[in-house]
Amino acid sequence: MDERSLTFHIGPVWFDGTVCMMVLLTCLIVFFLVYFFTRNLKMKPTGKQNALEWVIDFTRGIVTDNLPRKELNNFHLLAFTLFLFVFVANNIGLITKIVLPSETTLWKSPTADPFVTLTLAFIMITLTHLFGVKKLGFKGYFVNSFLKPYSFMFPMKLIEEFTNLLTLALRLYGNIYAGEVLLTLIANMMNNLGWFSLPLAIPLEMVWIAFSLFIGSIQAFVFVTLSMVYMSHKIEVEE
């Protein structure tokens, strides 16, 4: 796809304006969703409160499945916020497609950009190291993370840190980007073939949107789950 993004710079540093705008919009959507779903809370939840409590229980399950139960309060809010952000970021690009005549894209999923997913993965991997140092002290963290069970595995453990970062980021990026590419190809087919393509293109577009929504949800789950798995490797002492 020959698409370009809005760009701007602050001094010598250039930024992708489309991505910055979509990341900000994603944050606002998450904030207002939580605000809307938490208004007028009741002891007997109904409707929107049930939906929010289901997401809360779902993310609690991710944490307790991968970390000791005593760590639930420390990481549940992180998992909940991360899941909502990645879920919205994955699926926001399915709402519409805005491209200017100059081929400048104004609307897309932020996680369809590799720099966004690499940044998210870098933040999560960095947090695992910080929490490991906080809980075990620097010496305990270093020994637990890189020298156990055998010290000769240190080079492999070091390489593993980089592969964890890359796989966490590129898995998310690849799935979301591929979905948006195919949606764009279907839309281009409709544009090029005209009305004759509608009986085939519209059902195909609807099916692929539904499939992309499913994939986006699964990838949000996978991203949070792997983040908690990597966290457990850093804060749990290996025997």
From Swiss-Prot:
<comment type="similarity">
    <text>Belongs to the ATPase A chain family.</text>
</comment>
<keyword id="KW-0375">Hydrogen ion transport</keyword>
<feature type="transmembrane region" description="Helical">
    <location>
        <begin position="17"/>
        <end position="37"/>
    </location>
</feature>
<feature type="transmembrane region" description="Helical">
    <location>
        <begin position="113"/>
        <end position="133"/>
    </location>
</feature>
<feature type="transmembrane region" description="Helical">
    <location>
        <begin position="206"/>
        <end position="226"/>
    </location>
</feature>
<keyword id="KW-0066">ATP synthesis</keyword>
<feature type="transmembrane region" description="Helical">
    <location>
        <begin position="75"/>
        <end position="95"/>
    </location>
</feature>
<keyword id="KW-0406">Ion transport</keyword>
<dbReference type="InterPro" id="IPR035908">
    <property type="entry name" value="F0_ATP_A_sf"/>
</dbReference>
<dbReference type="InterPro" id="IPR000568">
    <property type="entry name" value="ATP_synth_F0_asu"/>
</dbReference>
<protein>
    <recommendedName>
        <fullName>ATP synthase subunit a</fullName>
    </recommendedName>
</protein>
<dbReference type="GO" id="GO:0046933">
    <property type="term" value="F:proton-transporting ATP synthase activity, rotational mechanism"/>
</dbReference>
<feature type="transmembrane region" description="Helical">
    <location>
        <begin position="182"/>
        <end position="202"/>
    </location>
</feature>
<keyword id="KW-0812">Transmembrane</keyword>
<keyword id="KW-1133">Transmembrane helix</keyword>
<comment type="subunit">
    <text>F-type ATPases have 2 components, CF(1) - the catalytic core - and CF(0) - the membrane proton channel. CF(1) has five subunits: alpha(3), beta(3), gamma(1), delta(1), epsilon(1). CF(0) has three main subunits: a(1), b(2) and c(9-12). The alpha and beta chains form an alternating ring which encloses part of the gamma chain. CF(1) is attached to CF(0) by a central stalk formed by the gamma and epsilon chains, while a peripheral stalk is formed by the delta and b chains.</text>
</comment>
<keyword id="KW-0813">Transport</keyword>
<keyword id="KW-0472">Membrane</keyword>
<dbReference type="GO" id="GO:0045259">
    <property type="term" value="C:proton-transporting ATP synthase complex"/>
</dbReference>
<keyword id="KW-1003">Cell membrane</keyword>
<dbReference type="InterPro" id="IPR045082">
    <property type="entry name" value="ATP_syn_F0_a_bact/chloroplast"/>
</dbReference>
<keyword id="KW-0138">CF(0)</keyword>
<dbReference type="InterPro" id="IPR023011">
    <property type="entry name" value="ATP_synth_F0_asu_AS"/>
</dbReference>
<comment type="function">
    <text>Key component of the proton channel; it plays a direct role in the translocation of protons across the membrane.</text>
</comment>
<dbReference type="Pfam" id="PF00119">
    <property type="entry name" value="ATP-synt_A"/>
</dbReference>
<dbReference type="GO" id="GO:0005886">
    <property type="term" value="C:plasma membrane"/>
</dbReference>
<dbReference type="GO" id="GO:0042777">
    <property type="term" value="P:proton motive force-driven plasma membrane ATP synthesis"/>
</dbReference>
